[in-house]
């Protein structure tokens, strides 16, 4: 059978029509069923116009393989994680292309316990079976069932268990759901907090789910996607802004002045919040930017543990270390009590509680950390020969470096600054992150120097 190019390193993503269509979705469902032989799995889909049809084709493939399907309807990826571990079923699949272009869709697959099915943990096996298409005949008597269910209330219960609602003082929040799947969840949290008497006001923008994305595809990692949130925070005098991508597995925060807060500093903030409640705990972080997280965690009596970037690696490391929390600078936050999975809803709830408990604004909470360890933000360079360019940078700094680490790409540390350079798994791009010890001009100069070396 033909090659299925929609199978990527960690998930399934492809252009609609040729790379991903209902026939391919059916084959993926059959292949998942033949490979894992699950009894019951949960399905959900994001707001994209094709998600429902792809999900139903996937369901048909699973049913034809003898699998019972529970459909939770329109959902974010983390709602599939939650459904999988909460119901104790054998796996789950979310149909989503997150922040990919309009003409794309995709899938994220998990097995029991919401463990990821990634490249070397089953995704290649599912791909092989789907490509071969050599499935046994459908046995009508053994065909799986299909049922629609709602777990929204149980999911909201779980989210609010991470905070004490009575810690919340008067708070005004701008929330930008980007017309993605987050809107109905935000509505449900708002209703629940109101019922509990919490003095939290929600100002909701682009809250209605709309697969045509009239306000652009939501990806607040891109500066051009931040304006609406920033302006709303300033206009309404809000305490904080929250923005989501399409399947809300990432959450992006803005302070009371509408300033975007880099995910790196939120990792430190959440680590501190967890260590106050769980002294001595382990915190997982990625290798791109590390000094702030290490300093915060160590000062709070915790143990920082570095892991390779990427959700499959972070989740596995969290399990082996029994870490309470893990954070990546890309705004992915992982929680032990959430089956070690990432959530875009838990972080903003914790930060909102922290703002109330400390009696400080979000800007005040991160200002000192940003000054102590200024960072470049991730800079992408499209290069013809990434490996040769990285080798050039390493050779240039080899004598000066105090430490070299290859957990993920190349990290080199010096007395007052450090950098990480890594090749993308998915495109011919090299990603650079630079940070310093309280010296913005040094950080900027070294960033410029490395970029010149990469492009020389």
UniProtKB/Swiss-Prot annotation:
Regarding protein family, the annotation reads: Belongs to the phosphohexose mutase family.
Task: Name its co-factor(s).
Answer: Mg(2+)
The job of this chain, per UniProt, is described as: Involved in GDP-mannose biosynthesis which serves as the activated sugar nucleotide precursor for mannose residues in cell surface polysaccharides. This enzyme participates in synthesis of the LPS O antigen.
> Which species?
Salmonella montevideo
The record, for Pfam families, names: PGM_PMM_I, PGM_PMM_II, PGM_PMM_III, PGM_PMM_IV
The record's GO molecular-function terms, alphabetically, read: magnesium ion binding; phosphomannomutase activity
Q: Which domain of life is it from?
A: Bacteria
> Sorted alphabetically, which InterPro entries does this protein's record hold?
A-D-PHexomutase_a/b/a-I, A-D-PHexomutase_a/b/a-I/II/III, A-D-PHexomutase_a/b/a-II, A-D-PHexomutase_a/b/a-III, A-D-PHexomutase_C, A-D-PHexomutase_C_sf, A-D-PHexomutase_CS, Alpha-D-phosphohexomutase_SF
Q: Which reaction does it catalyse?
A: alpha-D-mannose 1-phosphate = D-mannose 6-phosphate
- Keyword Acyltransferase present in the record's keywords: the answer is no
Cross-referenced CDD domains, in alphabetical order? PMM_PGM
Where on this chain does Mg(2+) bind? 98, 245, 247, 249
Name by which UniProt lists this protein: Phosphomannomutase
Q: In which pathway does it act?
A: Nucleotide-sugar biosynthesis; GDP-alpha-D-mannose biosynthesis; alpha-D-mannose 1-phosphate from D-fructose 6-phosphate: step 2/2; Bacterial outer membrane biogenesis; LPS O-antigen biosynthesis
**What note does UniProt attach to the cofactor annotation?**
Binds 1 Mg(2+) ion per subunit.
In the Enzyme Commission scheme, what number(s) does this protein have? 5.4.2.8
Could you list this entry's UniProt keywords, alphabetically sorted: Isomerase, Lipopolysaccharide biosynthesis, Magnesium, Metal-binding, Phosphoprotein
Q: Which PANTHER family match?
A: PHOSPHOMANNOMUTASE (PTHR43771:SF1)
Q: Which gene encodes it?
A: manB
Q: Where is the active site?
A: 98
């Amino acid at each position: 059978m033909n090659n299925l190019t929609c199978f990527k390193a960690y998930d399934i993503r492809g252009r609609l029509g040729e790379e991903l269509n209902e026939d391919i979705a059916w084959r993926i469902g059959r292949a998942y069923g033949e490979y894992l032989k699950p009894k019951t799995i949960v399905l959900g889909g994001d707001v994209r116009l094709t998600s429902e049809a792809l999900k139903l084709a996937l369901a048909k493939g699973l049913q034809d393989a003898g699998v019972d399907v529970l459909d939770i309807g329109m959902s974010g990826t983390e709602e599939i994680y939650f459904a999988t571990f909460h119901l104790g079923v054998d796996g789950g699949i979310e149909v989503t292309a997150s922040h990919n272009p309009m003409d794309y869709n995709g899938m994220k697959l998990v097995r029991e316990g919401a463990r990821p099915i990634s490249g070397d943990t089953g995704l290649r096996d599912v791909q092989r079976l789907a490509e071969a298409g050599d499935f046994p005949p459908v046995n009508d008597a053994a065909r799986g069932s299909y049922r629609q269910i709602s777990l929204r209330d149980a999911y909201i219960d779980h989210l609010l268990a991470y905070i004490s609602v009575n810690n919340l003082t008067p708070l005004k929040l701008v929330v930008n759901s980007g017309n993605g799947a987050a809107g109905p969840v935000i509505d449900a949290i708002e209703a629940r907090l109101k019922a509990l008497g919490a003095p939290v006001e929600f100002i909701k923008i682009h809250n209605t789910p709309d697969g045509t994305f009239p306000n652009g595809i939501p990806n607040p990692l891109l500066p051009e996607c931040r304006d609406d949130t920033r302006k709303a925070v300033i206009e309404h005098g809000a305490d904080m802004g929250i923005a989501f991508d399409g399947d809300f597995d990432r959450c992006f925060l803005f302070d009371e002045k509408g300033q975007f807060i880099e995910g790196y500093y939120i990792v430190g903030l959440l680590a501190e919040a967890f260590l106050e409640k769980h002294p001595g705990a382990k915190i997982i972080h990625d290798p791109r930017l590390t000094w702030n997280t290490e300093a915060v965690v160590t000062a709070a009596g915790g143990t920082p543990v570095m892991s390779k970037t990427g959700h499959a690696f972070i989740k596995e490391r969290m399990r082996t270390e029994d870490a309470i929390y893990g954070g990546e600078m890309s705004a992915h936050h992982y929680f032990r009590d959430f089956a070690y999975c990432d959530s875009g809803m838990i972080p903003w709830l914790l930060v909102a509680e922290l703002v109330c408990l400390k009696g400080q604004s979000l800007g005040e909470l991160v200002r000192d950390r940003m000054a102590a360890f200024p960072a470049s933000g991730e800079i992408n360079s499209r290069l013809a020969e990434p490996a040769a360019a990285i080798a050039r940078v390493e050779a240039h700094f080899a004598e000066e470096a105090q430490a070299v680490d290859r957990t993920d790409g190349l990290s080199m540390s010096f007395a007052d600054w450090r950098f990480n350079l890594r090749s993308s798994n998915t495109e011919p791009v090299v990603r650079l992150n630079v940070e310093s010890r309280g010296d913005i001009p040094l950080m900027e100069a070294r960033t410029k120097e490395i970029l010149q070396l990469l492009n020389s």
